[in-house]
Amino acid sequence: MEAERGPERRPAERSSPGQTPEEGAQALAEFAALHGPALRASGVPERYWGRLLHKLEHEVFDAGEVFGIMQVEEVEEEEDEAAREVRKQQPNPGNELCYKVIVTRESGLQAAHPNSIFLIDHAWTCRVEHARQQLQQVPGLLHRMANLMGIEFHGELPSTEAVALVLEEMWKFNQTYQLAHGTAEEKMPVWYIMDEFGSRIQHADVPSFATAPFFYMPQQVAYTLLWPLRDLDTGEEVTRDFAYGETDPLIRKCMLLPWAPTDMLDLSSCTPEPPAEHYQAILEENKEKLPLDINPVVHPHGHIFKVYTDVQQVASSLTHPRFTLTQSEADADILFNFSHFKDYRKLSQERPGVLLNQFPCENLLTVKDCLASIARRAGGPEGPPWLPRTFNLRTELPQFVSYFQQRERWGEDNHWICKPWNLARSLDTHVTKSLHSIIRHRESTPKVVSKYIESPVLFLREDVGKVKFDIRYIVLLRSVRPLRLFVYDVFWLRFSNRAFALNDLDDYEKHFTVMNYDPDVVLKQVHCEEFIPEFEKQYPEFPWTDVQAEIFRAFTELFQVACAKPPPLGLCDYPSSRAMYAVDLMLKWDNGPDGRRVMQPQILEVNFNPDCERACRYHPTFFNDVFSTLFLDQPGGCHVTCLV
């Protein structure tokens, strides 16, 4: 074994030249005002803040004065020379070297010393969807990452194979942060790999150091901060907890699986519906206050409703003579808002007659982890046939790991899709067959993982071949008790831009259908009246009326279970509530009870306040139809079908 010094940039400067004590105190106060909340949230002791500011201002990387990297070659005791030679000749023998970071300074390291905080640089920062492209295009990046990860190449290895190896191994090295401000896109999680020094720090359940990502605003640069949790003597190892913050032993075991492989096959993968306390906690977390019981308000025949809305598509398209727009929220009979109501109690007390476009507790439908939970009422712990098998990574990680390993053992398809609980437009959504990747994605935003549809029903596009497509229906919920549910007769289609295959999992235009938010991507437009005859031509044994009947059966079952229990376990029966949702679904090939191939609808998500731009453009009466059905109880002639 050998030890080498850690990275060195420049000597640590001991003072800020030309700065008076008063100026130094002022600079520290400004630094604390700007960065204090982030530092406190990360647990960085205040005794380090002064020296941290100095190191940030002057880019002082002085870890090399205190630490060294020890390289340990682990040799199998039982292995003879011949076997060792054979292993060395293999194309990629893997990481035979183990690295440790140790304290090399003779005087050791004192946790109480204000200088005992260190900056770690980041070698690579990216968003997951750009990783492959950067490895292929950024000069030197692939070589540096391969070296850092211990990927050795004997002979000429194709770069595509090298890239694939790095993309798999990087989940042992990736760390994540996200910005607190900006657009939805700007707040997407960023993944980074620390430099060679930071990446050599190993795990310990009782670590000697803590680390935290830190974004230094004046320079717009991200670092990782490293500080000791106790005093260390020379020769002691620097370690951190790779599962920091998690105390449950089983979940820790799962989180550490990328570094410490473990067999979870004996654990049940069963995921029953969560208990009532789970839903009560969600209600409290959402700060939603349930309404009091009220009597429905009856308006005189011919009453003209004043509508207050901040939804531009409603304001531009609603022309029905029974509705008039008002700029005064206080005068409105109907509130059709884009943002979520929270205080239904106050509304029910002060303005019980005001109609609104949402139901208390409708997040049970529109948030993906809740959707999966309530769906189990229809299909048991495995879920119903119309919803892909889904696990909440925050609460059901062990069950998911067990299920993944079971499928792996039986040679079954193991492609999965990670989705945030509550984002649309495929933001921060990833298709993968890497268990390590899924486990690590849990550390960014709250996510579910759903079985990726490996055998979707495809649509032949003459220009590109057979592609994935999804279907969007608009459903109108008139009331919870009794359940009254309608579906708009026109549906909308979205298509992938490249022929489908279970490869290139980060190829957005192959695996995703949401193209209408990227100005650089072509949106394939096919209207439903054109789609149906073309679909039946491609699949003559599957009449669209039969396929749609199965889709409507799935919608009916979903809303029945969503409304079956009182709040917060189900949607609240508030007489003044109405709602419009978009249900996105795909079709997959499955086997029916008789063994014949069937098209099984797969509900992907339910969206509150969907984008209705295409609906308004191609069907000018759309919002007149919606308002007549929901608020006038006059669905006749409104292009809707009653489901319940």
UniProtKB/Swiss-Prot annotation:
What the entry lists under Pfam families is as follows:
TTL (PF03133)
Task: List the record's Gene Ontology CC terms alphabetically.
Answer: centrosome; cytoplasm; cytosol; midbody; nucleus; plasma membrane; spindle
Query: Which superkingdom heads the taxonomic lineage of this protein's source?
Result: Eukaryota
Q: Where does ATP bind?
A: S450, K451, Y452, I453, K468, D470
Record's keyword annotation contains Cytoplasm = yes
In which tissues or organs does this protein occur? Expressed in the basal layer of prostate and endothelial cells. Increased expression in prostatic intraepithelial neoplasia and metastatic lesions.
**According to its UniProt record, where is this protein located?**
Cytoplasm; Midbody; Cytoplasm, Cytoskeleton, Microtubule organizing center, Centrosome; Cytoplasm, Cytoskeleton, Spindle
Q: Where is the composition biased (Basic and acidic residues)?
A: 1-13
Instruction: Show the GO MF annotations.
Output: ATP binding; histone H4K20me2 reader activity
- What keywords are assigned to this protein? ATP-binding, Cytoplasm, Cytoskeleton, Immunity, Innate immunity, Nucleotide-binding, Nucleus
Q: Indicate the quaternary assembly.
A: Interacts with MAVS; the interaction prevents MAVS binding to TBK1 and IKBKE. Interacts (via N-terminus) with TBK1 (via protein kinase domain). Interacts (via TTL domain) with IKBKE (via protein kinase domain). Interacts with tubulin alpha. Interacts with histone H3 and histone H4 (when trimethylated at 'Lys-20' (H4K20me3)). Interacts with CBX3.
Per its database record, what is this protein's job? Answer: Negatively regulates post-translational modifications of tubulin, including detyrosination of the C-terminus and polyglutamylation of glutamate residues. Also, indirectly promotes histone H4 trimethylation at 'Lys-20' (H4K20me3). Probably by controlling tubulin and/or histone H4 post-translational modifications, plays a role in mitosis and in maintaining chromosome number stability. During RNA virus-mediated infection, acts as a negative regulator of the RIG-I pathway by preventing MAVS binding to TBK1 and IKBKE.
Instruction: Name the PANTHER family for this protein.
Output: TUBULIN--TYROSINE LIGASE-LIKE PROTEIN 12 (PTHR46088:SF1)
Protein name according to UniProt: Tubulin--tyrosine ligase-like protein 12
According to its UniProt entry, this protein's organism is Homo sapiens (Human)
